[in-house]
Amino acid sequence: MEAFEISDFKEHAKKKSMWAGALNKVTISGLMGVFTEDEDLMALPIHRDHCPALLKIFDEIIVNATDHERACHSKTKKVTYIKISFDKGVFSCENDGPGIPIAKHEQASLIAKRDVYVPEVASCHFLAGTNINKAKDCIKGGTNGVGLKLAMVHSQWAILTTADGAQKYVQHINQRLDIIEPPTITPSREMFTRIELMPVYQELGYAEPLSETEQADLSAWIYLRACQCAAYVGKGTTIYYNDKPCRTGSVMALAKMYTLLSAPNSTIHTATIKADAKPYSLHPLQVAAVVSPKFKKFEHVSVINGVNCVKGEHVTFLKKTINEMVVKKFQQTIKDKNRKTTLRDSCSNIFIVIVGSIPGIEWTGQRKDELSIAENVFKTHYSIPSSFLTSMTKSIVDILLQSISKKDNHKQVDVDKYTRARNAGGKRAQDCMLLAAEGDSALSLLRTGLTLGKSNPSGPSFDFCGMISLGGVIMNACKKVTNITTDSGETIMVRNEQLTNNKVLQGIVQVLGLDFNCHYKTQEERAKLRYGCIVACVDQDLDGCGKILGLLLAYFHLFWPQLIIHGFVKRLLTPLIRVYEKGKTVPVEFYYEQEFDAWAKKQTSLANHTVKYYKGLAAHDTHEVKSMFKHFDNMVYTFTLDDSAKELFHIYFGGESELRKRELCTGVVPLTETQTQSIHSVRRIPCSLHLQVDTKAYKLDAIERQIPNFLDGMTRARRKILAGGVKCFASNNRERKVFQFGGYVADHMFYHHGDMSLNTSIIKAAQYYPGSSHLYPVFIGIGSFGSRHLGGKDAGSPRYISVQLASEFIKTMFPAEDSWLLPYVFEDGQRAEPEYYVPVLPLAIMEYGANPSEGWKYTTWARQLEDILALVRAYVDKNNPKHELLHYAIKHKITILPLRPSNYNFKGHLKRFGQYYYSYGTYVISEQRNIITITELPLRVPTVAYIESIKKSSNRMTFIEEIIDYSSSETIEILVKLKPNSLNRIMEEFKCTEEQDSIENFLRLRNCLHSHLNFVKPKGGIIEFNTYYEILYAWLPYRRELYQKRLMREHAVLKLRIIMETAIVRYINESAELNLSHYEDEKEASRILSEHGFPPLNQTLIISPEFASIEELNQKALQGCYTYILSLQARELLIAAKTRRVEKIKKMQARLDKVEQLLQESPFPGASVWLEEIDAVEKAIIKGRNTQWKFH
């Protein structure tokens, strides 16, 4: 009776595993097998979707029968048969052996107030069952003791019959348990149990009565389960279906049933898997593995504890073990020791059947057919026989080796955006070339060139040229392979799924007819390719040459280096620059900028020349394309593989970031004129040269786009935006839409990386909210620019929001006088943005930032403005009491004065433990309401991201009932409602430490302000700083030097202007005597002026020196003419005009004297100017903060 004790329903119902499958129909996959009937094979297909709850009804009763068979296995009276039948919708399951005890159940009778017997309790009462509480060594398939009850609930009628050797018990249950008729009990010596029932088909989505198809489908499914049970119970018990014995009394027979039709003549390997410790050792598993090339993916049938198990750790364990063995065996089997072979899923040709019992498992999933147990149980206790693994592995490897076959070079290939050469793959295949275009626009150019026809009969055409698109990007294959080295030193290269499925690279493989298992060392091997070479046709920019072409070369070097050695990989080198001289139609063409620079230096002037850049293939017009394709062969350059190339490929495209970082710490060494001449003379490009110049330039450019320069704290994009903003808003600072301003920047600053990226950068430059990257925005945002809630990701569309330049801040932080002294980036031969700014204050340590690039991490936490001002002023002002102390600290590279993290706009706390600072959010506890109110989050933690991180933490959510966010963009108010009696438990589980209290630990209200101070250097490459002081110390000399340069330049300009104005005043005084109007031409007048000692001057340079250096001013300003005098108009000779010039000279002289004083001041020239500009910046920042950076 104890086995049928009635339990508490509430506790029972809490178990998720007790609930049945879904009532709606779903696709039941994998339910197909075959069986032998009079020596014929018959298929059992499933034609339609079925209701899991209905299948569960049948399954629960079948599992009950197999559980009973296992329970009686060691008893005197065993179960010798299980009879399952299904006819006209009526399901029946009968087994012999001890029946259900026929005795009155006192507890149930008392509750029901009538006589209730144990069979009724077992089949009709949800609060009782033998499987509710199971021991750890239990191998029953039943889970919660409710399976039979659920079957009764979903049945129109059911008949329960059981005999215990003394009595026979028959009871009718109707109307889904609504009517339980009194049982009929009669004397009997029989021992058996039978369940018959008719499910409520109509309510489960079936016809009533069942249609022929439904009857056939359900019969097939039940028969399969009967066959599975036959394999599970073994030979001692016979399983009948519709009175015919099932012939699958072993795991081998069950495996044959599933695979004979789909994979005849396949090899079947069987084994017994034993465990080394109880209770697992008492129940070995039977395994059969069917290996066949017919199978295209791993499949399994698993009957554990009588349940048809669709998933489980036992399958994972077996699959992993097989995979390891196959990989090892495959490596040992390949004869060619240098062959690079790829392996896909090593289990894709296996169908595995597992039958047996596993103690102590749990059943999960909606249908309770997913086995759950710790995977280490199998690793620790179970061992698979080596003979089984060896024989099966050999079969699998044989199939894998057979699948490595040569590709048919003459077959048609179906690849997107591919046009086949007419002779490709034929007798003249080696005369064909595949043109690999960077993108669609390049394809268009190639098509134009290849279809010139009669106008270029000797040029390339589709007869011998095919073309394919690279799609604008190529995957880095070097990072998508795993090299496996065997004990014998053999290397096997395994491509991952991403690389295997990459359409672009697989398209190239198919089009060329490449074989991953061929080296192409011999001409015979290369002759089997569909083309004689591949020609990369990419843009002449960094993305095209440095990235896409580099990745294509790396792909061939990785798998087929011999093809590069034998000249198979080439490139189309198109003109980068064309110079059109006035009056001439044939331009001078240059393929490298170094060639153009060398040529330009030899020219006296480029005034009569038009210089046009062609970085994109699409820039060439039809006429230029025709001209190029007339000399097509001369533009095709072959790559060569030199000794150093292998290492460089590994550095730039491999997975070892430390090697790449060391290489990228230095800038690119440009090609010399000699190198370019050598390349043109032989039309060959060493791979190492391409990698050291083009690929390295691309990598460094990528770094500069992602990591800021330490001098200005800006990436290249932000620098372009600032330079564009200064230029765009110079005359009128009216607001402009973000997308309009983005178009201006792209046009005037030559931004080539897409509108979306540029607009995002503009929006970020104007964002100003607690936690935003920029504490000092260079633009004023008008509209919704994002909030703290989503970390700025909720900004409005660039079409609807506008920006203005934060001119008051920009003018003081970036003085206009500096702009003439900075080095500039030249794009397409035109001046764009500065290579770097050197602001009045070290902006690099004044703002937040985080970004990875090429193995480096860049993370900065803004420092306190007051500390920065104090340090810079102490450096500049010799009268500052800390001046000498700071210079001592800089000299000896030590830290003395504080440089703390900024707490501006942050209401939390900053604390230092050891070498790191930590930021802490704040909270208030209301014990009465059982609520914790978070009033501030750690620095730079967006609200939504924070709440999501808490919700994902299961050990925290066990204490939390609800999280409600009432935060605004400026303030934090997050209510964390706790479950009853949780506060004390939180204090116990989340310990209080010196660094954080229990609530801070529990709510994750602390983050570490750990920094990665990696910045771009002024001349390219990366510099790694250890402290913020080092950044400041490195920046100070650059800013200091700028003042000296500025003053020296101003001094030179003032002197030249004074000379010019003095000469003009002298001429006005002597004009009557000179009387130049009497001379016939300018040449004669100039001679007279020269004889009278007037200096020839370059008036244009003196009036508008702009970007001229001091050296240029001193050299060219005095090498001019007398236009500054001869162009004077009559009114400029009047006494009033002369008086104004004399006053102007006096002012310039006074300023010159002041500049000379500033050049002589200590501690360095321009120190007082720097102090004044620091004061101006401070005032602008205070005003900006007080006005939310609106400045009004």
From Swiss-Prot:
Keyword Isomerase tagged: yes
Binding site for ATP: 64, 95, 142-149
Catalytic activity: ATP-dependent breakage, passage and rejoining of double-stranded DNA
Record-annotated site: Transition state stabilizer: 799
Annotated localization: Host cytoplasm
Keyword vocabulary terms for this entry: ATP-binding, DNA-binding, Early protein, Host cytoplasm, Isomerase, Magnesium, Metal-binding, Nucleotide-binding, Topoisomerase
Record text on cofactor binding: Binds two Mg(2+) per subunit. The magnesium ions form salt bridges with both the protein and the DNA. Can also accept other divalent metal cations, such as Mn(2+) or Ca(2+).
Annotated binding of Mg(2+) 1, by residue: 438, 539
Keyword DNA-binding tagged: yes
Active site: 800 (o-(5'-phospho-dna)-tyrosine intermediate)
Segments forming domain Topo IIA-type catalytic: 707-1174
Annotated TM spans: none
One CC-aspect GO term: host cell cytoplasm
Classification via PROSITE patterns: TOPO_IIA, TOPOISOMERASE_II
EC number: 5.6.2.2
Example GO molecular function: DNA topoisomerase type II (double strand cut, ATP-hydrolyzing) activity
Record's note on what induces expression: Expressed in the early phase of the viral replicative cycle.
Main location: host cell
InterPro entries given in the database record: DNA_Topoisomerase_II (IPR050634), HATPase_C_sf (IPR036890), Ribosomal_Su5_D2-typ_SF (IPR020568), Ribsml_uS5_D2-typ_fold_subgr (IPR014721), Topo_IIA (IPR001241), Topo_IIA-like_dom_sf (IPR013760), Topo_IIA_A/C_ab (IPR013758), Topo_IIA_A_a_sf (IPR013757)
Binding site for Mg(2+) 2: 539, 541
Cofactor: Mg(2+); Mn(2+); Ca(2+)
Highest taxon listed in the record's lineage: Viruses
GO biological process: DNA topological change; sister chromatid segregation
Family that this chain belongs to: Belongs to the type II topoisomerase family.
Known role: Type II topoisomerase. Processively relaxes supercoiled DNA. Displays DNA-supercoiling activity only when associated with the viral histone-like protein.
Protein name, entry field: DNA topoisomerase 2
Organism classification: Viruses, Varidnaviria, Bamfordvirae, Nucleocytoviricota, Pokkesviricetes
